[in-house]
């Protein structure tokens, strides 16, 4: 009888920490990539993404928001949740297992960009478009 391996949940956020201690918390793009490579996508049950992973992303969102605003990624010096999203989709394109992803970012524009990217991949591959924006209880 083979024991079922533990499935992990990855929580990407540079500031917040989820109340539920079952999440594996990563704070940056580099940590995100390292942890997923270490654990393996086949052992991950769920990924929750933040968009703004540093000061310049936060400033771009807070000070640039106007009607019909689009994020100018040229103004952001650190990698964002969008970079993590693109990396993740590239893993799927390379044949790695597709896992469920949600977005918990307060940045509505960044969230929309990530959700669109993820759900477009799923749509093009005839999968359920189940990537949604959620609120996860956190300590900060």
Predicted regions and their residues:
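Catalytic phosphate/metal-binding cores of nucleic-acid and nucleotide-processing enzymes, i.e., regions
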Residues: 1-140
């Amino acid at each position: 009888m083979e024991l079922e391996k533990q499935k992990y949940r990855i929580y990407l956020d540079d500031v917040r920490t989820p109340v539920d201690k079952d999440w594996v918390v990563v704070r940056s793009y580099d940590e995100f990539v390292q942890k997923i490579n270490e654990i393996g996508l086949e052992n991950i049950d769920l990924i929750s993404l933040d968009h703004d992973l540093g000061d310049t992303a936060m400033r771009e969102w807070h000070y640039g928001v106007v009607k019909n605003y689009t994020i100018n990624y040229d103004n952001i010096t650190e990698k964002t949740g969008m970079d993590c999203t693109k990396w993740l989709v590239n893993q799927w394109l390379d044949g790695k297992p597709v896992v469920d992803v949600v977005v918990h970012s307060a940045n509505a524009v960044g969230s929309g960009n990530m959700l669109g990217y993820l759900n477009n991949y799923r749509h093009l591959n005839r999968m359920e478009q189940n990537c949604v924006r959620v609120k996860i209880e956190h300590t900060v």
